[in-house]
A protein has these predicted regions:
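Charged, low-complexity
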Residues: 1-38, 111-113, 118-119, 133
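Walker A/P-loop NTP-binding motif
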Residues: 30-31, 49-63
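Conserved helix-turn-beta segment of the N-terminal RecA-like "Helicase ATP-binding" lobe
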Residues: 75-99, 193
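Inter-lobe coupling linker of SF2 helicases/translocases
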Residues: 110, 114-131, 148-165, 188-249
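Walker A/P-loop
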Residues: 35-55
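Conserved helicase ATPase motor motifs in RecA-like P-loop NTPase domains
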Residues: 164-178
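Inter-Walker segment of RecA-like/P-loop motor cores
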Residues: 89-120
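Conserved Walker A/P-loop ATP-binding site and its immediately adjacent core
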Residues: 64-85, 179
Length: 249
């Protein structure tokens, strides 16, 4: 497989040893060239940041370097640090003071990955409307409410990724309360994947009792990859916690 060979070479110099499920997830994102986006939805603690880092590394090596990471503000510095320490990729954090210079048409944007917060993306949406090679959205469950039409941040991110070659959403909880949340996430990067909200509801929400659950699972599996902790415990040593009851004396 061409992508497997390329990744092996790319990761030779990386300061990280990806686990098999992380490589699988990265390959899933890279081997879907006709999809505008994917969701990497591994459970908490399985290294979705590493998976995205591998994808970014591949794009970087191909000199497709117009890359944007949208993340909670508290994680911006961590992303910058991990990209450089683990993958030797430089990144810079966008803020209101630097945005005009960094996003100016003549600026050599390809010298570093750009990182911004969700708040920044919402406030400065117009400045971020461009032909990105890759957009990564971390903690993307923040975008699940896109289906309601009331999520301003989700709407802004959807507009931003509209011009991207590929979008990668990272979230451990793609679904929490309503099936429509799945529709909301996928529609961030592909508004027509489920045709329309009405069509989705008719087929999958109302039709769940008619046995359409398998069909929905198949449709979602085409755009989403999820590994559970129990599937990864053979090569990740999780801390085992045992509750102990101690009597007060």
């Amino acid at each position: 497989n061409d992508h497997v060979g390329k990744l092996a070479g790319l990761l030779f110099d990386a300061q990280v040893e990806p686990k098999p499920h992380q490589i699988d997830a990265a390959l899933f994102a890279l081997q879907t060239p006709f999809l505008p986006g994917v969701i990497l939805a591994d459970e908490v603690g399985l290294g979705k940041t590493i998976e995205a880092g591998i994808v970014i590394t591949q794009y970087w090596a191909e000199r497709k370097r117009n890359i944007l990471i949208v993340t909670p503000s508290s994680l911006r510095q961590q992303w910058k640090q991990e990209l450089y320490e683990k993958f030797l990729i430089p990144a810079i954090i966008l803020d209101p003071k630097s945005k005009d210079a960094l996003l100016a048409p003549g600026h050599g944007r390809q010298s570093e990955v750009l990182i911004c917060s969700y708040e920044f993306a919402q406030r400065h949406e117009q400045s971020l409307l461009r032909g990105w090679d890759l957009v990564v959205a971390d903690e993307a469950h923040r975008l699940r409410n896109h289906w309601t039409g009331k999520g301003k941040t989700a709407e802004a991110v959807s507009h931003i990724v509209g011009g991207a070659h590929k979008t990668v959403l990272l979230t451990a909880t793609p679904l929490q309360n309503k099936l429509e949340e799945l529709y909301g996430l996928v529609s961030v990067f592909d508004p027509s994947y489920f045709y329309s909200l009405d069509a989705f509801r008719e087929r999958y929400v109302k039709g769940l009792d008619l046995g359409n659950g398998d069909d929905l699972a198949e449709r979602v599996a085409s755009v989403a990859k999820r590994t559970l902790r129990r599937d990864a415990d053979k090569y990740i040593h999780f801390t085992k916690r045992m509750p102990l009851t101690v009597e007060f004396t």
